[in-house]
């Protein structure tokens, strides 16, 4: 009898564990009505913006405004009190993202008087691939020296007269650049980055992750600017200072990545960077009902584009890739490349012939995009193992202009 009870108990435990494993979690974007209960003030911006950020605005005659005021903490606390977990927040959009496993919590959140909209932006995937715990062992840093100072990057530098700018002293010294991307795989071990002035890193997808173990895309983008190994690989801004910010979740393609990106952009503004490069863009998602349509490319419809359009008001120079959809059915630029006052960069080869994969414009309101073209065919970039490789994409055209 006792053995039977034991068997039943084990079965019940197994069923409970299975049900627990099947519990889905979701993330929702919540729009707030106002910032009425803020504890911050426009006349005391040093409470939420760094001295460097304020100096940048002062030099350009740009005022602090209500979008700079952080999201109301009291509103967030009330969401948490209903059972939601805070994931991210955006003061420019006056939104937060919360995570729940019980969707009835969202009904309670939506009923709050200061909430104007709620939208699901993420559903937990069935599995997440493990990161490479032995990534550092991949790095050999085996390189071949060139007679040219820029190494394999000499063509992409010369096409844009970057060598002339460097000779005149414009090598990025004194400038701060934020790179918002998918991850910076092995950038902490690759020799072309040794000596890079790194101001810091931040992961807006998962604060507990190692950005150097995530996707390699951001590392390759970074190498177009920050590489500084003479006769091997030298980038466009080798003496600049860098923030490495991860907003792309490589495991899924869901709208919440726009929220991560918006928060990363706001962080870059708050710490006082001068230039932001982002070689990311979205128009289709795992849930195809969330895909953008051409009529949405008005510079404001997507959360990313709305945030990007505000960057210039803060004194930021935002440079973004146009996208690589030229050969496909979409063909068009991808948000945030449709935003106003951002520099959207398409790809060309070393002879300045348009790359057929480079996304095209115009925007739905008739603005010409991309704004400029740069080398994005066979671009010299750092490889995952520290060698020098070549890659195609507007992702590498964009940083070549930074």
Regions found by a protein language model. Name each.
Residues 1-24:
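Bacterial Sec-dependent N-terminal signal peptides
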Residues 22-85, 104-128:
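Primarily auto-inhibitory N-terminal propeptides
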Residues 23-25, 117, 153, 163-203, ...:
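Subtilisin-like serine protease catalytic core
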Residues 36-37, 93-94, 105, 124-126, ...:
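Solvent-exposed loop/turn segments at secondary-structure junctions
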Residues 76-157, 163-166, 340:
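Autoinhibitory propeptides
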Residues 181, 334-402:
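Extracellular S/T/G-rich loop segment that most often corresponds to the catalytic His/Ser-adjacent loop
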Residues 268-298, 321:
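Short acidic, glycine-rich surface-loop motifs adjacent to enzyme active sites
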Residues 299-315:
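Catalytic-core regions built around general acid/base machinery
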């Amino acid at each position: 009898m006792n053995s039977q009870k034991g068997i039943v108990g084990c079965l019940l435990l197994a069923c409970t564990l299975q049900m627990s494993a099947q519990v889905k979690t979701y993330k929702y974007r919540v729009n707030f009505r106002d910032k009425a209960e803020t504890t911050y003030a426009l006349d005391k911006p040093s409470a939420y913006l760094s001295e460097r950020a304020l100096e940048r605005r002062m030099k350009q005659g740009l005022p602090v405004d209500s979008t700079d005021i952080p999201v109301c903490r009291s509103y967030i606390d009330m969401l948490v009190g209903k059972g939601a977990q805070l994931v991210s927040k955006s003061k420019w959009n006056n939104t937060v993202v919360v995570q729940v496993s019980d969707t009835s919590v969202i009904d309670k959140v939506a009923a709050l008087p200061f909430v104007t909209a709620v939208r699901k932006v993420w559903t937990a995937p069935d599995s997440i691939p493990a990161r490479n715990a032995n990534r550092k062992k991949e790095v050999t840093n085996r390189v071949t020296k060139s007679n040219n100072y820029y190494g394999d990057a000499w063509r992409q530098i010369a096409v844009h007269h970057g060598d002339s700018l460097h000779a005149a002293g414009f090598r990025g010294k004194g400038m701060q650049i934020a790179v918002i991307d998918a991850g910076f795989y092995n950038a902490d071990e690759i020799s072309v980055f040794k000596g890079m002035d790194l101001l810091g890193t931040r992961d807006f997808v998962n604060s507990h992750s190692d950005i150097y173990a995530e996707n390699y895309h951001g590392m390759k983008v970074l190498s177009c600017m920050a590489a500084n190994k003479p006769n091997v690989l030298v980038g466009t801004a080798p003496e600049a200072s860098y923030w490495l910010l991860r907003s792309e979740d490589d495991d899924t393609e869901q709208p919440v990545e726009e929220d991560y990106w918006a928060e990363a952009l706001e962080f870059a503004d708050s710490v006082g960077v001068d230039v932001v490069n982002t070689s990311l863009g979205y128009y289709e998602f795992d849930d195809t009902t969330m895909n953008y349509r051409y009529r949405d490319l008005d510079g404001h419809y997507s959360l990313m584009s709305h945030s990007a359009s505000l960057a210039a008001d803060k004194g930021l120079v935002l440079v973004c890739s146009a996208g690589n959809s030229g050969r496909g059915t979409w063909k068009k630029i991808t948000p945030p490349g449709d935003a106003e006052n951002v520099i959207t960069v398409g790809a060309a080869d070393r002879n300045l012939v348009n790359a057929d994969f480079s996304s095209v414009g115009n925007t739905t309101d008739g603005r010409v995009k991309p704004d400029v073209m740069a080398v994005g065919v066979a671009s010299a970039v750092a490889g995952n193992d520290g060698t020098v490789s070549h890659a195609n994409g507007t992702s590498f055209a964009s940083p070549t202009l930074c």
